[in-house]
Design a protein with these regions (language model features):
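Conserved acidic catalytic loop of the alpha/beta-hydrolase fold
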Residues: 1-10
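Alpha/beta-hydrolase-fold enzymes
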Residues: 14-103
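Short, conserved loop/helix-junction motifs that constitute active-site signature segments
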Residues: 29-30, 118-122, 147-150
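Active-site nucleophile elbow and catalytic-triad environment of alpha/beta-hydrolase enzymes
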Residues: 96-117
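Short beta-strand/loop motif that positions the catalytic acidic residue
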Residues: 121, 127-129
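Short alpha-helix in the alpha/beta-hydrolase fold that links the catalytic acid
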Residues: 123, 136-147
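Acidic beta-to-alpha connecting loop that harbors the catalytic carboxylate
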Residues: 131-133, 171
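Catalytic active-site module of serine/aspartate enzymes centered on a nucleophile-bearing elbow/loop
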Residues: 157-207
Length: 207
């Protein structure tokens, strides 16, 4: 749609959490010029931060699918836990597999297109992870980046103290208190395809 409504304009994308994964699943991923992902992974439980792993496993991979099985969908609004979510989506999220193509959505995409579409993305890609994000650990971020074989990928790891904070976590990057410290990192990448010299954090070495 963006290409149709704004012909000739570059298409840049920012994706948080599964949104970063979704950027590589669309048929139009090859149109993306630059991509910034924040805490982007696909919830493989062994990649969760060790100190939170079993609590998170119980919440997302046991309790959530159990409630969904009982109710026929996940009543997130009523529980104050996310939004109401279809049963098929919950089953896909909660499946404990290290390979995306083994999930039901991954199998469906592979059956339709013959391959996983991540490799079609050729964007300059910056994956940002925060050290106190129990979902976006280095293994989790790298697991997803490994699917983007057609793009040039950089992984920036930021500690809260790098920006004078005690905590940031998984959900706070795009909240207004971080407008002056974190948002410019994403903006610089979208505008120039590179990090400014004074960017907080460190690049994660990639094999």
């Amino acid at each position: 749609r963006a290409q149709r409504e704004f012909p000739g304009q570059p298409i840049d994308v920012v994706g948080h959490s599964f949104g970063g994964c979704a950027a590589g699943l669309g048929a139009s991923g090859h149109l993306i010029r630059r991509l910034v992902t924040v805490g982007a992974q696909f919830a493989y439980w062994r990649d969760y931060a060790p100190e939170h792993r079993w609590r998170m496993f119980a919440k997302w991979h046991v309790l959530m699918p159990l409630v969904t099985m009982i109710c026929g969908y996940f009543p997130g609004k009523r529980l104050g836990w996310l939004e109401d979510t279809p049963a098929g989506v919950v089953r896909d999220w909660s499946l404990s597999t290290a390979r995306y193509e083994k999930r039901s959505s991954g199998r469906a995409i592979s059956t339709t297109s013959g391959q996983m579409p991540f490799a079609g993305v050729t964007a300059q890609t910056l994956a940002i992870s925060i050290s106190d994000d129990p979902y976006g650990t280095v293994p989790a971020i790298e697991r997803l980046l490994g699917y983007f074989t057609g793009s040039t990928n950089s992984h920036l790891r930021i500690h809260p103290e790098d920006i004078g904070e005690e905590e940031v976590g998984h959900f706070a990057f795009f909240r207004s208190p971080y407008q002056a410290t974190l948002w410019p990192i994403a903006l610089a990448w979208l505008q120039h395809g590179e990090l400014a010299p004074d960017t907080p954090g460190r690049r994660v070495p990639r094999g």
